[in-house]
Design a protein with these regions (language model features):
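Conserved Rossmann-fold cofactor-binding substructure of NAD(P)-dependent oxidoreductases
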Residues: 89-110
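Rossmann-fold scaffold of SDR-type NAD(P)-dependent oxidoreductases
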Residues: 41, 105-114, 155
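N-terminal Rossmann NAD(P)H-binding glycine-rich loop of SDR-like oxidoreductase domains
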Residues: 38-54
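Conserved glycine-rich Rossmann-like NAD(P)H-binding loop of the short-chain dehydrogenase/reductase
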Residues: 60-73
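Conserved residues in the N-terminal Rossmann fold of short-chain dehydrogenase/reductase
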Residues: 68, 91-92, 132
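Strand-loop microenvironment adjacent to phosphate/nucleotide-handling motifs in alpha/beta enzyme folds
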Residues: 26-36, 141, 147, 177, ...
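Conserved Rossmann-fold NAD(P)-dependent oxidoreductase catalytic core, especially the SDR/UDP-sugar
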Residues: 113, 117-121, 125-173, 177, ...
Length: 354
């Protein structure tokens, strides 16, 4: 059994892990991260903070570098996190600045690229800013990683990149394509290279509907765009686990997608603000009624690896021997938020308390 098989055996466990299974997963992550220097772009964001806390809890990385442009958030983060072993480093910078990235990436083993502009309505009215950060910034990350021989680069992407109807999704689709294509420029095939994780909305993240509803409910009136609207949801903890699993499994070029449940937004309103009146305001620019995590074209090269799906790249450098024990999904497979199982109210409540 090779390393990939061992990792898959450990990370593709049932949704609700036993204590022993959680220990097995943690051992895998511990081994992959041992003595590594890890840099997270956008490290002061919601995912970055969750991820950094997890890395500190694991304890085996040699150094954790938070790369972001907001010095106050870095200050707050430094004050709030317990770092008795002095593993944290804060690096002010913007992914638009290649020279700054070049300096930050010196000696780095793993880069998790989470920096992005993501507020859909704002980006519709500021398109060039979205392109500068989400596309050109991603290319800067790639160039800096290649020039510094970074072993692994993992892009954090979104379901908005699938059949995009807004600028945010289009920029993330471009970022995904750039990451996958970058593997052709690897100097050493033994280096894992560049891969992607793609998931849905993160419960409780900054600017999410949960945050909006929490602000609105005190007034007794909450807003809903469309009663039919559905969304994929993942907890912050689930997003962190996906990132760590991908770092354990990646060979370079894959897109990792978790198996998620979805929900109707009207059910979320009933859970978060059960006693409030609801005002229907209509879909905002760039929104969909339902989201999807796989295009029909991607289905034909997607494998089911238990708790995740893995999209294979369409490049001649891609090797599949390590995946021979995992089947492709059916050709008529569809992964959309209106067709997967929807969360029950009690499940929603449980996720909201995580």
């Amino acid at each position: 059994m090779n390393f990939f098989d061992v990792c898959v055996t450990i990370v593709t466990l049932p949704l609700f892990y036993t204590f022993a299974e959680k220990m097995a997963k943690n051992l895998t992550h511990t081994a992959v991260l041992k003595d590594k220097v890890i840099l997270i772009t956008g490290g002061t964001g919601f995912l970055g903070q969750k991820l950094i806390q997890k890395l500190l809890d694991i304890g085996t990385p040699r150094k954790i570098i938070i790369f972001s442009r907001d010095e106050f958030k870095q200050h707050e983060m430094g004050q709030s996190l317990s770092d008795p072993k002095g593993k944290l480093r804060f690096f002010l910078g913007d992914v638009r600045d290649l020279a700054r990235l070049e300096r930050a990436f010196k000696g780095v083993d793993i880069v998790i690229h989470a920096a992005a502009l993501k507020q859909v309505p704002a980006l519709e009215y500021n398109p060039l800013e979205a392109i500068k950060t989400n596309i050109l910034g991603t290319q800067n990350v790639i160039d800096a990683a290649l020039n510094n021989n970074v072993k692994k680069v993992l892009l954090v992407s979104t379901d908005k990149a699938v059949n995009p109807v807004n600028l945010y999704g289009a920029t993330k689709l471009c970022a995904e394509r750039l990451l996958v294509a970058a593997n052709a420029y690897r100097k050493n095939e033994k280096i894992a290279g560049f891969s992607v994780v793609r998931y849905g909305n993160v419960i409780g993240s900054r600017g999410s509907i949960v945050e909006i509803l929490e602000r609105q409910k005190d007034s007794g009136l909450v807003t809903l765009t469309d009663k039919r609207m559905t969304r994929f949801w993942i907890t912050g903890e689930g997003a962190v686990e996906l990132v760590l699993d991908a770092l354990s499994l990646m060979k370079g070029g894959e897109i990792f997608i978790p198996k998620l449940k979805a929900m109707m937004l009207k059910d979320l309103l009933k859970t978060v603000a059960p006693n409030c009146k609801v005002k229907i305001i209509g879909i905002r620019p760039g929104e969909k009624i339902h989201e999807t995590l796989l295009t029909s074209d991607e289905v034909r090269r997607t494998r089911d690896i238990k708790n995740h799906y893995l999209i294979e790249p369409e490049h001649d450098w891609w090797k599949t021997e390590h995946l021979k024990n995992f089947s492709y999904v059916p050709t008529d497979f569809s992964y959309t938020s209106d067709k997967v199982r929807h969360l029950k109210p009690e499940e929603l409540k449980s996720m909201l308390t995580l």
